[in-house]
Amino acid sequence: KIDPRAKNPDSLKWVYKYNYIKNHYWDNFNFARAGLIRTPVFQEKLNTYFKNMILQMPDSLIGPMIQLIEKAKKNTEVNHYIFLYLLNESNQSQIMGMDKDFVLLSEKYVLQDPKTWLDTAVVSKIRERVNAIKPNLIGNIAPELKLQDSEGNYYSLRQMNAKFTLLYFWEPDCSHCQKTTPILYKDLYQVLKSKGIEIYAVLTQNNKEKWMKAIQEYNIQAWTNVWDPNYSSNFRKLYDVTSTPIIYILDKNKRIVAKRLDVDSSLKFLQAQPEMK
């Protein structure tokens, strides 16, 4: 019941109505009827619930995901459909951090289930994907990298002394890197360096000559520019580096707080942090 003395009763009514609809959204759905999953109505119902009713944040979505999968156990076909829908959505989502939900769903319902119903090849692909992203999930301490500069001096990622460290994977021949690197330097590093931002820039290839030329061209000598000429650090696997450029943002404790953002989004993210005020 809404207190009539509330300062904004209309807003409270809206919140109450929203929570009621969200909490009772599946009350009259018969999970035992497998035929429903072959109708466009069911797909639309799933989309509406998970994309409009639930706050679009990984921690807000995972609970309702698991609840719905459990409810759907009344019918194997319905259960499998919903699980695959949610697994694919979490894997393909553009929401930062949804890979965490993909890992949680994969481990709970596939990798930790000795009687999984999925094909062996599918399970193998899921395991491979989990192994690729689990080390670099948001909230994790960033896997250590100790890489060398052009003169052979080694620099530790975890020993970077900064409020925030941008871990930047790039290569001189990458067309996107050629656009991103100067923007990263001018629009982010130059703007925030006085507030405690450092960049640990990792060359992903092994052409030293092109690398040195690019460092000079982009005027990024102030960055910690490192490479792994023998590919001995396993950085590609640790950080799921399959393309470039890639940006990870680490806090002062080297915990991953954001990942795979463009320069503009990285700048906005950092400027919103209390430490940068």
Give the location of each predicted region:
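A structural signal for short secondary-structure junctions
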Residues: 139, 160-161, 192-195, 217-219, ...
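Oxidative protein folding and maturation machinery
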Residues: 1-146, 150
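Short active-site neighborhood of thiol/selenol oxidoreductases, capturing the structured segment around
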Residues: 153-185, 198-200
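Short, internal strand/loop/helix patches
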Residues: 143, 212-248, 252
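Structural microenvironment flanking redox-active thiols in thiol-disulfide oxidoreductases
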Residues: 178-216, 232-235
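Short, ordered coil/turn segments that flank beta-strands lining enzyme active or ligand-binding pockets
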Residues: 150-151, 252
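Non-catalytic, surface beta->alpha helical segment in thiol-disulfide oxidoreductase systems
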Residues: 243-246, 252-277
